[in-house]
Amino acid sequence: MAIKKVGILGATGTVGQRFITLLSDHPEFKIAVLGASARSAGKPYAVATKWKQSIAMPKEISQMSVKACDPKEFSECDIVFSGLDADFAGEIEKSFRDANLVIVSNAKNYRREPTVPLVVPTVNTDHLDVIKYQRQENKLDRGCIITNSNCSTAAVVVPLKALQDAFGPIAQTNVVSMQAISGAGYPGVSSLDILDNIVPFIGGEEEKIEWETRKILGSVNSTISGYELTDNVVSAQCNRVPVIDGHLMCISVKFAKTSPTPDQVREVLANYVSEPQKLGCYSAPKQAIYVFDDSTPDRPQPRLDRNNENGYAVSVGRIRSDSIFDIKFVSLVHNTVLGAAGAGILNAEVAVKKGLM
């Protein structure tokens, strides 16, 4: 397979930096262009950014000249990954698609568009098939927009997908989140607000989980031109907690028909295999869902489990019967890997494998 040249929009931000760490030694994708704001354009990357990752900035990246977020600067790229903030992403990403470029976006702006795939790679890569209709609709032969989910949504939909496939439709889902501060970007939440504290509000977050879950767990329509939302009714309450990385979610599920036992749920989750695994994608986890049994009742924990499978796995524990719903459990996702940049990369890997780009 020929190596794909890729670009990164918002390369100096938190998500952009995570894209760089995950792509710097990727065997199939090579970083060709870094894009950021006008004040960063023209500067060496090492000068333009405040590097906040736990591993060193790759040497070959540090001296790359940052470009403006202009499609002309990215014309050589096969794929452009966007880590842009939603305040800027809408117009810029559309201009890239209109220039016949492939955009894989972490921003919320196009997630609700009828012909734009909203994909968590270990859940619903079949939704990528609608790319063909999106191109037809916009009279493009190559350009398109693909979005990945909100970071917290990923922790919800991966286990729900496995359960839905095994036990049939889910009627109701209740979610209470404990979300890491890196989800707010840099500089993010003030230390005076988060130290010795929990903030029981994250603007827009609950609505994202409630709606995105229904699109992701839904299906492609009969004409492969859009999506049918699932009937699952989702209620979410979101909290910011003093953890750097890793969103922990307490989830309760009521099924429309079958009510499985905790042991049945454990078995289904442990044996779940996603399409990226079947396709042999480079970034695909060997185990999509890590399952903790009753011998480890205090897991998963962000500090101990967020890096399972290099952050591409979801970890699930405390699986129990629920007196109001049917089943309850705790789910953990690395919010900047499977919940952000990693999802975009794995989505692109799947799209390449399927001949969609």
Swiss-Prot record:
It catalyses: L-aspartate 4-semialdehyde + phosphate + NADP(+) = 4-phospho-L-aspartate + NADPH + H(+). NADP(+) binds at T12, G13, T14, V15, S37, S40, L84, D85, G183, N335. It comes from the Eukaryota. InterPro entries: ASADH-related, Asp_semi-ald_DH_pep-lack, Asp_semialdehyde_DH, NAD(P)-bd_dom_sf, Semialdehyde_DH_NAD-bd, Semialdhyde_DH_dimer_dom. GO terms for molecular function: aspartate-semialdehyde dehydrogenase activity; NAD binding; NADP binding; protein dimerization activity. Pathway: Amino-acid biosynthesis; L-methionine biosynthesis via de novo pathway; L-homoserine from L-aspartate: step 2/3; Amino-acid biosynthesis; L-threonine biosynthesis; L-threonine from L-aspartate: step 2/5. Its EC number is 1.2.1.11. Belongs to the aspartate-semialdehyde dehydrogenase family. It is an enzyme of class 1 (oxidoreductase). It is found in: Cytoplasm, Cytosol; Nucleus. This is Aspartate-semialdehyde dehydrogenase. PANTHER family: ASPARTATE-SEMIALDEHYDE DEHYDROGENASE. NCBIfam families: asd_EA, PRK08664.1. The active site is at C151, H247.
